[in-house]
Amino acid sequence: MEIQFLGTGAGVPAKHRNVTGIALKLLDERNAVWLFDCGEGTQLQILKSSIRPRKIEKIFITHLHGDHIFGLPGLLSSRSFQGGTEPLEIYGPVGIADFVKTSLRVSQSRLSYPLKFIELTKENDVIFKDKQFTVRCNILDHGITSFGYRIEEAAHEGELQVEKLQALGIPSGPLYGKLKRGETIVFDGQEINGQAFVGERKPGRIVTILGDTRKTKNSVTLARRADVLVHESTFNKHEAKMAKAYFHSTSQQAAEVAKEAQVKQLILTHISARYLTKEAYQLQEEAQEIFPNTKIVKDMDIIEIPFANEGGA
């Protein structure tokens, strides 16, 4: 599991930062990619990455401002043009279906795959769940309807302790599969309980990706004990009044959310073009005053999300 940042800028594309596009790469987990927001130029950024559009299984839109959705019609059309046939689901605020359907209709674009819309209307709602993942959403504070998303991975079964089995002379093969499932087998007249040879279950990972927002209690709820929190940082710590007026957050407000939620790592994105490279890293330093494990990302950065016992992100 890893996150690739296709665009880390705010408002409009800039020379060094495209507008928002975040890919949660679940290739090992389900051979799929989930995309969070799709600002103008996102598909060009995808071309610079290893992501294949046909692998995009779900798209989660945080809100309907242009810097988060203007790249969507083009990406959907290109996915079809490139031979994509796998179904695609789009989650987002009420209006996302109308935006996409109107864009496709006016441009006379036809898709080669089924497209399903799930428009969100409830706070603190489970919007997707299967054996692997649960996705929750909650409303943020951005003037227009804006959502944050919490992706919870189910626990992983413990590893089979092969060395212990080999010490008993049990050969690899079908018996290992039964033992891995916790079944009891008979080997050389002795009962072997598989549960005694399977390690502890690994807790699933949690990723929280927030849309544009002021600091709000819902942000803390969504981020509670997450392995990674992706939070906007549109303004520096000296511009709190401006952040409030424009329904955005400062670097230190993002850090306060991370600290209150007890997350493991804070990722800052949605960086204004007013902050060049040096000034942008000052945002990181400001946040680190409150939450040390903070990183500001640039376009195309990849953040790996290991299991808890494999070290920090």
Curated annotation (Swiss-Prot):
Pfam families: Lactamase_B (PF00753). The gene is rnz. Belongs to the RNase Z family. It catalyses: Endonucleolytic cleavage of RNA, removing extra 3' nucleotides from tRNA precursor, generating 3' termini of tRNAs. A 3'-hydroxy group is left at the tRNA terminus and a 5'-phosphoryl group is left at the trailer molecule. This is Ribonuclease Z. It is an enzyme of class 3 (hydrolase). It comes from Enterococcus faecalis (strain ATCC 700802 / V583). The keyword Nucleus does not apply. Zn(2+) 1 binds at residues 63, 65, 142, 212.
